[in-house]
From Swiss-Prot:
Signal peptide annotation: none
Enzyme Commission number, as recorded: 6.3.2.6
Catalytically driven reaction(s): 5-amino-1-(5-phospho-D-ribosyl)imidazole-4-carboxylate + L-aspartate + ATP = (2S)-2-[5-amino-1-(5-phospho-beta-D-ribosyl)imidazole-4-carboxamido]succinate + ADP + phosphate + 2 H(+)
Family indicated by similarity: Belongs to the SAICAR synthetase family.
UniProt keyword annotation of Translocase present: no
Protein name per Swiss-Prot or TrEMBL: Phosphoribosylaminoimidazole-succinocarboxamide synthase
PANTHER family: PHOSPHORIBOSYLAMINOIMIDAZOLE-SUCCINOCARBOXAMIDE SYNTHASE
Organism of derivation: Azobacteroides pseudotrichonymphae genomovar. CFP2
UniProt keywords, alphabetically: ATP-binding, Ligase, Nucleotide-binding, Purine biosynthesis
InterPro entries noted in UniProt: SAICAR_synt/ADE2_N (IPR028923), SAICAR_synthetase_CS (IPR018236)
One BP annotation, GO: 'de novo' IMP biosynthetic process
Length: 323
């Protein structure tokens, strides 16, 4: 099955191209971003060699729907979706931190807790907690934003002391983070899911804070099924979840955790297909709609055409308004 792992277009008025872990980001003019959600998959801050069919479409369309459903909380960068794998929006100056919020003790937080750590980003964790247990209140554990390599945990105090974010702006980011997580929790609950943890990225434009990048996708979030959560928790069983964690678990079974000297294992085509179906399952569960699979015939040409058509139409509207 076809998938798209990289692009290298040259659009009119394009000024910059950046290849992220899973997204290709084009700057057009001085105030517009064209972001293509590719089918690349990363774990432990390493991009794996094979792409996952439909993953980019799943991420892009989930993020777009959640951007629309949270726009009353704060403005966001999105302007249009000219293609199932593309969002075009405002260019904002990103804050140099990512806001991670956790409702449950799981994933990397649990691994550190199990090793005896009781503070995370200067947040004190209760004693006696078990894996996948709900925190009394969601905790915010920010990370530095690494364009290459590993993101690093950082405390609120360090962020302010290092002038990464002003105290006033950081407190606003905390407020938005909790409000977005509450909204995401409510939407997930209505679909029989638990929003376990997630991350948000913010930026500034003309003095206003905007929500940027993806939101509540399986790459940025972790979901449990709520139906049998309590039973599994009481039995000490692993939770059935919809997230990238199952890919991380697979990698760890292959003795890979992104550490220096470790060899990245290659996923088989069969396993890639399993991962693809898990992503589609999450889309249909959290969105509550059937996933319409876009054609995988010449994906790159389709995307290029759709973006160029949007940019041309936007330029025509701009020209007409000037006349």
């Amino acid at each position: 099955m076809n998938y798209l792992t990289t692009t290298n277009y040259c659009f009119p008025c394009q000024t910059h191209l950046y290849h992220g872990k899973v997204r290709d980001v084009y700057t057009v003019g001085s105030d517009m971003l064209v972001i293509i959600a590719t089918d690349r998959i990363s774990a432990f801050d390493v991009v794996l060699s094979r792409g996952i069919p439909y993953k980019g479409q799943v991420l892009n369309q989930i993020a777009a729907k959640f951007l629309d459903s949270t726009s009353d909380i704060l403005p966001n960068w999105k302007l249009a979706e000219p293609d199932p794998m593309v969002t075009i929006g405002l260019l904002c100056e990103p804050f140099k931190v990512e806001m991670v919020i956790r409702g449950y003790l799981t994933g990397s937080a649990w691994r550190k807790y199990k090793e005896g750590e009781r503070t995370l980003c200067a947040v004190t964790l209760p004693e006696g907690m078990k894996e996948n247990e709900k925190f009394p209140n969601p905790i915010i554990t920010p990370t530095t934003k690494a364009y290459k390599g590993h993101d690093e945990n950082i405390s609120k105090e360090e962020i302010i002391e290092r002038f990464l974010v002003s105290k006033e702006d950081y407190e606003q980011l905390e407020y938005y983070t909790r409000a977005l997580f509450q909204r995401g929790t409510e939407i997930a609950s209505s679909k029989g899911l638990i929003l376990v943890d997630t991350k948000y990225e913010f930026g500034k434009k003309d003095g206003r804070i905007y929500l940027i990048d993806e939101i509540h996708t399986p790459d940025s979030s972790r979901y449990f099924y709520s139906e049998d959560y309590q039973e599994r928790f009481e039995k000490g069983e692993g939770q059935k979840q919809l997230s990238k964690e199952f890919v991380r678990q697979w990698l760890m079974k292959q003795n890979f955790q992104g550490k220096e000297g470790q060899i990245v294992p290659e996923m088989t085509p069969e396993y890639c297909q399993i991962v693809s179906e898990r992503y589609i399952e999450l889309y249909e569960t959290i969105v509550g709609e059937q996933f319409i699979r876009a054609s995988t015939s010449n994906i790159s040409a389709r995307i290029k055409k759709n973006i160029e058509t949007y940019l041309m139409n936007k330029e025509q509207v701009k020209w007409n308004n000037m006349v």
